UniProtKB/Swiss-Prot annotation:
CDD domains in UniProt: KH-II_30S_S3
Family: Belongs to the universal ribosomal protein uS3 family.
Gene Ontology molecular function terms on file: mRNA binding; rRNA binding; structural constituent of ribosome
Role summary: Binds the lower part of the 30S subunit head. Binds mRNA in the 70S ribosome, positioning it for translation.
Subunit structure: Part of the 30S ribosomal subunit. Forms a tight complex with proteins S10 and S14.
Pfam families in the cross-refs: KH_2 (PF07650), Ribosomal_S3_C (PF00189)
Name of the protein in its database record: Small ribosomal subunit protein uS3
Gene3D superfamilies xref list: 3.30.300.20, Ribosomal protein S3, C-terminal domain
Xref: SUPFAM superfamilies: Prokaryotic type KH domain (KH-domain type II), Ribosomal protein S3 C-terminal domain
Gene Ontology CC annotation, any one: cytosolic small ribosomal subunit
GO biological process: translation
Protein keywords: Ribonucleoprotein, Ribosomal protein, RNA-binding, rRNA-binding
Amino acid sequence: MGQKINPTGFRLSVLKNWSSRWYTNTKKFSDFLNEDISVRQYLQKKLAHASVGSIIIERPSKNAKITIHTSRPGVVIGKKGEDIEILRRNVEKLMNVPVHINIEEIRKPEIDAQLIAASITQQLEKRIMFRRAMKRAIQNAMRLGAQGIKIMSSGRLNGIEIARTEWYREGRVPLHTLRAEVDYGTSEARTTYGIIGVKVWVFKGEQLGIKERQN
């Protein structure tokens, strides 16, 4: 099962936490979910060049707190905080509640799965050979402390007629072990030959579960 399932969803409540952290009654659930999707799409579009790894949305009583994990916090904040204030006002219009935006820096973007996937897709769109992009990402991740990494690319690689899938792995990536901290990210490269999908798994070591850490 660990081979097929999303590694993040597989470890929810054991090692990982949800990216949307709120609870509501049945009537409002679909509205809140649509708001979350709209906010994420807006932020990902506006911060496309800010190397955003993840977006956490929390909803305390009648307001919202959004945490943006990025390797380039200066790009998100902008000169004298102007850009982040514009973001906050626009997100408030989408959510219809007061919003607080918090920025957290990703210290090692080379071992963040989502940023690795985004970096590879950017290189593919610039017509860089997919093997070179994948191998370079693997070397950087292993050099900066990853215990294992696996990268998979699918589509018309190098413009070939028949789509295929290629993957590279270095180190170990235990997909069945629940206590294994496996970071997972996906991205799509829009090339002249069509879309190329990229998936990245990064194994950062084994950890105690959420409940064990609390005890």
